[in-house]
Amino acid sequence: MTVVRISDDALALACGADAVAEAFAAAGCTVERGSSWGMHWLEPLAEIEGQGFGPLEPGDVASVMDGSSGKAIGPIEEHPFIARQQRLTFARAGKTRALSLEDYVATGGWEGLKKARANSPAAIIAQ
């Protein structure tokens, strides 16, 4: 089954992301809602196996699924807006579900806390 990731942030919702998500679900896809990549001019933006499509409308779903969409932007991580960034605070943005502890753990979450708990207060301050 095809997994389609679509942002559920406020801007994506205002641009019609819910309707696009419903259209993908109606086409038999598994829809995962997550955080935005921050490319708001491409919302609603759908990601399928790392490939981006946007901005989409519900009527675009069939062409995305059959590979004929003119709204393909290529690999999202290679898009010029994303590729030139060094994401620190937002390293997980667009890659995880914002409220998912499972996604947080799978992408290295808690590692800083584990490291801190293994050190004394003085060692933490010294770092």
Where in this protein do the model-derived segments appear?
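Feature of Fe-S/electron-transfer and energy-metabolism proteins
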Residues: 1-127
